[in-house]
Amino acid sequence: MIFNASQDSKTEIEYQTISSTQTYLAEEQSERLHNLISKEQLEKLNQAFNERPDSQVGFDDLRGLLLEQDITFNDAVYNRLFLKINQNRDFMVDWNEFVSYLIFGFQEEDPSSQKESLILPISVAPSVRKTEHRSTVCCVALLKAKSDQVPIEEVTETVNFSFGGEDSPEASGMWVTASHEGMLRFWTSHMEPIRTATSESSKPHAVYCMSYAFYNNGKVHSKLVLGDYAGNVRILSYSPNLRGPFQAKPGAALIEVVWADVLKGKIPQMIPKEYINLHNEMISCVHYSLHMNALFATAEYRNTKKYRGRCPGMIMVTYDERSNFRVPLGVSTFFVAESHNIVVTGGPDTFVRIWDVYIPTEPSAILTGHNGGIVMVFVQPEENKVYSVDYQKIIKVWDLQEHTLLQTYGELVRLIHPSETDMTYFYHSHLRELIVAGRKLISIKCCPRVRVDLTDGNTHAAPVSVVLYNRLFRNIVTCGLDSYIIVWDPWSGRRKIIMKNCHTKMIYGEIIDIEITAATFDPLEQFLLTGARDGTLKIWNYNNAVVVRNMSIMPDQEVTSVIWVVDRILAMGWDRQVTEFNDVEGREYGDPKKWSKFHTDDITCADVKLGEGVVTATYSGEVIFWKLETGQPYRRYSVMDPTRFIELKLTPEEEKLMRRSKRLMSRLGSSRMSRATAITMPKADDGRDYGQNVPISVQAVLFLQTRPQTIQHGSVFISLDTGYIQKVYSHHSRGGYMSQFLSVHKTGDCVLTMCTDRKNRYIYTGTAFGYIKVWHIVNYPEAEKVHVCMPRLRLEFIFMRKEFWVTRAKRVVRHQREPLLVSSYKAHLKAINSIAFINLPKIVFRGSHDYSCRLWTQGGRYLGTLGTVLPWSKLSPFERAGSENQVYRLPPDIKKVASSTTLKVISGVQMDRPAKRAEVKAPEDRDEETAQTDDGYDLKKIFDKPLKEPILGKHFTLPGKSVMDQRIDVDTTQSYIAVYTHLKVHHTEMLERLPTPAVISRVAGENYMDHYVPVEGKVDLSGSALNIKQPPRRNVRPNDPRNMRMAKTRGDMGPGPSPSQQSE
């Protein structure tokens, strides 16, 4: 490709890229100009620029200035260097452009750009469960298996990934929760209950906070720090060797220690130390740093009239030397980051302060933004993040170096009742989880590590929509539905530039990110053009993240495809037409040109052949070819009836529809037409140009750039949602449809994206189910016969090697001679949205709906995922990627679902021949003869000896069926099947009633009134008995012997209670 520098200049710049058409460069020459220029050379170049007219130099002049400073490049490298420097595209370089290029080179090497996160620190939904305590949890602790403090000689480089073993109790420990009634509950790291216990203790002053410091090696004495309500701090020091003073004693299930005995030295294993009245108020938080051999203790001083803001909020004690960190109102909580030698404090004054431990007079930074007192702070030193929680349950995340706010998390306000104010917090530094305890247990993951046993990491925070390779800068550009544009260096795996919030829209005062749906480069690949879902387009200088130009096709109409040719930009999407923008200097901001609107549905995809034509396809299966120079359509097809000629004119119904849609759009303004309305406009029974009633949508189109525009050469591939790829015979004005082939092997799958190599020998397809297929299309169509070396293809593509059974991918195409399927494997778990190919190193990379962009060799070997936390395999743009001696691994997510074909292709390993079983011999001959097969496999070494009966051992045998199953002949002569007529229905019988026992019958016939005698009584409190007084009878006979006998009995009893009453 050769582009003229300008119309007024005769200078021509040859744009050479690293491709199969360029000669191989034996030695890579660096284009990093900032590494080659010294300070003296830069001053001389500045003087030379100032001596030039207008302080500008041309193509040859700049090369001469560099030669004067002994900086030389060959022709190919200098061409690329000049295009990188010339950002104004006028082929004249001024001093600002030259210095900007040097600055960009230093920015690419800045390691801070690698640590910028794509997602918010707290982006995972919290887990909530009940505490199972009778009252509110007042304390949460962690039974640690590993210490957070590590000796300096054992400090290693921190990594941001894990292998999944940190969830075990041996690595993460157990949680312990306590409530006011003395109940203790033990939990696993996943908050599953283990057991329950109770605890009681007594001290002269109640202990309010504790801290425990220890090393894993056990060479340093462990420290147990106690802070009480009186402002005292006590330290217990003991050796952890052989469990120290906590050794089990025979006959004692529980070891009790009295503090007075510890002070008197009766327990020699424990060394106490007291700091009486270290603070005048209650100790709020304590910590002992073994690395600095220092004690930190804080207290709150809320009585401003008494202390007048001169209170020592935090005191650091080192070898009996005290350092006072004065904070108004005191300190409620703090966190010591020993790796950074800083202390982060928070208190009732709503400020988060960052201190240097050796400068107590003034904080290094003050973070403001909370509306309530700070109750919890902690630091992630490896991530350079500070987390703070206030009294109103709002979590804020800060950058430790730049002291900026990263995130405000308010989900706790919704999960916790407003009446719950005294919450307990604990941060698990190993699992990176924040535990919030009250009436509920809430676990919040704070910037969790990547589980490399489950995934290699993500490239974007949302599905990747477009991937591109820039041949000028030799980097990969990915665009996602998260509205991010990221520039990657594929040779080192580094992230060079990240641009966030690229397309935005304000809705009700809130800025909303708009998804990026299309992207491409300019012809010289200096600028990037992106299209979004709301119809906006932007031109980016993606080296400095600057927007050069803003455009739009139609409000709220998604851009599905963009094309950038010389002096023109073409955009198409849901507005059903092609919009042309000028790219000529001086005419950039004029009104765009609208091509004729012949499509009746939304445009889904488009492609261009430079200098010849453009092809567009719609959701309803329409395909139209356009002249690139004039924008006039010359051929129209329908994929449902591709051989039928369709005249390029609108029918009366379509003209009426167009006029109606124009009126509707003029009335609604920026309102968006739904896709369903656009599809249901044509009548279902009118199939003149649309084939069947159900439309077939076009998913992707691909132009073969090396195929000439003749009737005999096919040049366009069209992918349908049915899984087929139709081959349009030619984009010639008299060309037509030729053939089609099945491109998937699973029902419901279809090709979503396609690309090809520079010479159009292979076509790479990505499907909706995540499969990658490589097709050899040199002899497709069959009229163009070229000799193909099949052994060479088998060496490169292991998929083509013979197997003992035909796999599913091969069974589908076993009767299809052309095109030849050379590779097929599963690359992603979700749909593949975009695919691209790097020619010289033979690398294929894809952007998927699973948030990742992965690099593969042409043969199917896995190279890596952009944005991974694992080490990157070194690649070169001048050498072919992959070697036969290299061991390749599988992506962790693919490894769990991979088929035998995918495992063979990705690993590159295939068993030559399976083990054959020996022929069946008589039982007496088996022990004498060997079971050696023809292939050299010894089955006796594999299986040892034949299994003996019973193979399953002693087990329960199911009883046999008592009756045979009755065969049911279903009557299918009627319009429905009477199923109930064939069912066995057993009539119910009355159960025999058992006779009632005589005792129960006698009890049931009794009347409790027969045993009832009304009495009058009152309670005698002195004697704790009842004085019963029977009611008088109606007919009292004085001479009745029964009355005389009753009176005599009463006289004998006297006033005291009877023995029977006492017993009662």
Curated annotation (Swiss-Prot):
WD repeats: from-to residues: 153-197, 326-365, 369-408, 459-498, 511-550, 598-638, 746-785, 827-866
Residue ranges, compositional bias (Acidic residues): 925-935
Biased composition (Basic and acidic residues): 914-924
Keywords: Repeat, WD repeat
Entry annotated with the keyword Oxidoreductase: no
Listed InterPro entries: EF-hand-dom_pair (IPR011992), WD-EF-hand_domain (IPR051242), WD40/YVTN_repeat-like_dom_sf (IPR015943), WD40_repeat_dom_sf (IPR036322), WD40_rpt (IPR001680)
Record keyword Repeat present: yes
Name of this protein: WD repeat-containing protein on Y chromosome
Organism in which the protein naturally occurs: Drosophila pseudoobscura pseudoobscura
